[in-house]
From Swiss-Prot:
The gene is nop9. It holds the Pfam family PUF_NOP9. The keyword rRNA-binding does not apply. GO terms for biological process: endonucleolytic cleavage in 5'-ETS of tricistronic rRNA transcript (SSU-rRNA, 5.8S rRNA, LSU-rRNA); endonucleolytic cleavage in ITS1 to separate SSU-rRNA from 5.8S rRNA and LSU-rRNA from tricistronic rRNA transcript (SSU-rRNA, 5.8S rRNA, LSU-rRNA); endonucleolytic cleavage to generate mature 5'-end of SSU-rRNA from (SSU-rRNA, 5.8S rRNA, LSU-rRNA); ribosomal small subunit export from nucleus. It is found in: Nucleus, Nucleolus. The keyword Nucleus applies. RNA-binding nucleolar protein required for pre-rRNA processing. Involved in production of 18S rRNA and assembly of small ribosomal subunit. Residues 1-52, 484-505, 664-697 are annotated as: Disordered. This is Nucleolar protein 9.
Length: 697
């Protein structure tokens, strides 16, 4: 059967493509010219093989409209540039620099390569993280130059998915240097590539210029997905407040924020941004104006709607907090203040507009965060009305609710002794239900506040004892779920394995562990409930608890807490005998072994027995990183070579000598010559005294 005649080869394929494009072009010229429309998202997702040509008249009319609506595009890095910055990121990750000077030279070389491409890198998905790391390792002058490159583009950068993170890092790292005086750059320090001199503006002036760039857009940026985080950082910097981007519980960290770790050379200076920093006096006026502008265009209804908005709520929290902490509690009386607009009636009487709004936020996952901020920062009069008219009437239901319980905890942290005593009596009937449902946030806060306010915790201990089993061992199982801690290996299913190799911890078990640790701090019946349970628990269960990262902290607390008695430790510690090797080689168990060193100061014979077990396993311990740390903490080299000195150290005699010796210096042993000099001086002094007495007589 004859085959169809086909042309083969690259040239034939190119010829067919040219003919096909020619046919399409001829067909398009026959159709009437239509007005060009902005492509939809579906059209943008598909690659366009052919773009139709419009007449010049339509093109001139439509291009300005597109420029007004589209986000500015700063271009893409070419292949060679991508490869260079990828290799630079790998070099930083390996961190094989011998000195800090080598690292600074490398950072400067990256800046040289990035000249003129700073905006491209900041908007690049693959290179923006590298820029964040470089900013963290840069000097103040390098950051100032980069700041100057970003000026004029911040309105677009703060709304960009990747560039916004670079802006945040730049603001945070530059903030501690705001109080430094700006020196005039010499003529040699001129950027030659584009003929632009090093920015003459000070860092404070640069921040003020950022504010002017964003001015007029605050209302929109409050709820913008990426810009809201950067706006919060900017507000904190203006206020001189510490900014911690790594903390997921902070007001500025995103839930999906990926940590950008920076490896530093030993001895390299690190700028700590978790402390208050000095800011120019003009910043306070700017901060007040910015906060006023943010809410000036919003009516009260929309402002209250931000309380339940998942993006606007954190900004609203920050505005309330900064308003009350930096401009005084008296600002709450100003009708234009954020707090006054949210809560116009500070009496908080039942049925009032303020009470209805406040009550509606108590059980809302987002709104309750704002309530916590208000409770923590509100003036005393407003807080007392909130506690009296809203919290106390609903205290039972608040303690049972998973979300509202955190608001109750904030109230317990602030109330006085008499009010705390009343709240304790009202919450105690709910304790059995809370223990059964593992809602331990409120009971733990109650114990903590009672210890601070010096309130008797015996009624709380009785309520706990009645809600738990009478058998001490079973009681501890109910408190800690020790049956679920089956061993040192905390394996997770493939789908549950966490990112970055961190072991996944059960939130319920973590809360129970923290609750039991807080019980151990309370003297009397509360701590006795735990101590009796530990003594009654089997050795296998105790060892499993010691090898669990969560329950191990309970055992460490039981051994080192001030409420721990010598009698308890003498009964409890022998359970670890013959298990020291297993514990010393385990990540969690090794911390317990370290705690045993301090816990056995007054029971030396037990410490000596445990040390002998470690000495018998010397080879295995020295082969393990964790084991070597235990070997060092127990001074096992001293144990093997100079047993007498180790004995004194094990009994804590060295600490007593250091406490008696001022400054911790070793007392100098006097030589025979020093003693002879002292005797001679004493004899000379006595002879002089006798001669003076004879002269007087």
């Amino acid at each position: 059967m004859p085959r169809e005649k086909q042309k083969r080869g690259r040239r034939a394929q190119e010829k067919e493509k040219r003919e096909e494009n020619k046919r399409k072009l001829e067909d398009d010229h026959e159709e009437p010219a239509l007005k060009r429309q902005r492509p939809s998202s579906e059209d943008q997702a598909e690659p366009a093989d052919y773009i139709p040509l419009d007449s010049g008249e339509h093109e001139e009319q439509e291009i300005p409209v597109a420029d007004q609506n589209d986000t500015p595009f700063y271009g893409l890095l070419d292949t060679e540039e991508q490869e260079y910055f990828s290799r630079a990121a790998e070099v930083l990750e390996l961190n094989q620099f011998q000195t800090a000077e080598e690292q600074s030279i490398f950072v400067e070389s990256v800046y040289e390569e990035a000249k003129g491409k700073e905006l491209k890198i900041a908007c690049s998905q693959s290179c923006s993280r590298l820029l964040e790391k470089i900013i963290s390792l840069s000097s103040t002058d390098q950051r100032r130059r980069l700041f100057g490159k970003f000026l004029g583009h911040f309105l677009n950068l703060v709304q960009h998915r990747f560039a916004s993170h670079c802006c945040e890092t730049l603001f945070v790292k530059v903030a501690p240097a705001l109080s430094h005086k700006t020196h005039n750059a010499p003529k040699k320090q001129i950027i030659e590539e584009e003929g632009n001199e090093e920015p003459s503006l000070s860092l404070a002036d640069m921040f003020l210029q950022v504010i002017s760039e964003l001015e007029g857009n605050w209302g929109y940026l409050l709820t913008e997905r990426f810009a809201s985080h950067t706006i919060r950082v900017l507000l904190l910097v203006l206020a001189g407040e510490p900014v911690d981007l790594s903390s997921h519980g902070s007001l500025v960290a995103s839930k999906a924020k990926e940590g950008v770790e920076v490896h530093r050379i030993e001895g390299q200076e690190r700028v700590v941004s978790t402390k208050h920093h000095a800011v120019p006096d003009a910043f306070m006026d700017v901060l007040k104006k910015v906060m006023a502008d943010m809410t000036a265009g919003l009516d009260d209804t929309y402002l209250r709607a931000l309380a339940t908005h998942h993006i606007g709520n954190p900004v609203l929290q920050l505005l309330v907090s900064l308003e009350l902490s930096h401009f005084g509690k008296s600002t709450a009386k100003d009708s234009r203040s954020v707090l006054r607009r949210l809560i116009p009636d500070d009496t908080m009487e039942e049925g009032s507009q303020s009470a209805i709004f406040f009550t509606g936020l108590l059980y809302d996952p987002v709104g309750s965060r704002l309530v916590e901020t208000i409770v923590r920062s509100a003036p005393g009069k407003l807080f007392k009305n909130i506690h009296k008219n809203i919290i106390r009437e609903r205290i039972a239901s608040l303690s049972r609710n998973e979300i509202a319980s955190y608001v109750l905890v904030r109230c317990l942290e602030r109330v006085g002794r008499d009010d705390l005593q009343t709240d304790l009596e009202m919450i105690i009937p709910e304790v059995p239900n809370l223990i059964e449902r593992s809602r331990l946030t409120v009971p733990r806060a109650l114990i903590e506040r009672c210890l601070i306010r010096n309130i008797d915790t015996t009624p709380l201990a009785k309520a706990l004892q009645e809600s738990l089993d009478k058998d001490p061992a079973k009681r501890l199982q109910q408190l800690l779920e020790v049956n679920n801690t089956d061993g040192p290996a905390e394996e997770a299913t493939p789908s549950e394995k966490p990112v970055q190799g961190k072991p996944k911890t059960s939130p319920v078990l973590l809360h129970k562990s923290l609750f039991v640790q807080k019980m151990l701090e309370a003297p009397g019946a509360l701590s006795e409930l735990v101590y009796s349970g530990l003594i009654a628990t089997s050795t296998d269960t105790i060892i499993n608890m010691a090898c669990n990262s969560v329950t191990s902290h309970v055992l460490q607390k039981a051994l080192t807490a001030p409420t721990s008695t010598t009698q308890f430790r003498r009964q409890f510690i022998p359970q670890f005998s013959s298990h020291m090797k297993q514990l010393a080689l385990d990540t969690s168990g090794s911390h317990l072994v370290d705690a045993l060193w301090d816990a056995t100061k007054d029971i030396y014979f037990v410490k000596e027995r445990l040390a002998q077990e470690l000495a018998d396993s010397e080879h295995d311990l020295r082969d393990s990183f964790i084991g070597r740390a235990v070997w060092k903490n127990w001074s096992m080299d001293l144990y093997k070579r100079r047993r007498g000195e180790w004995k004194g150290k094990a009994k804590g005699l060295d600490d007593k000598v250091k406490a008696l010796n001022i400054g911790g210096e070793k007392p100098r042993t006097k030589s025979k010559l020093d003693l002879a000099r002292e005797r001679y001086d004493a004899s000379q002094k006595s002879a002089a005294d006798r001669s003076s007495i004879g002269t007087k007589s």
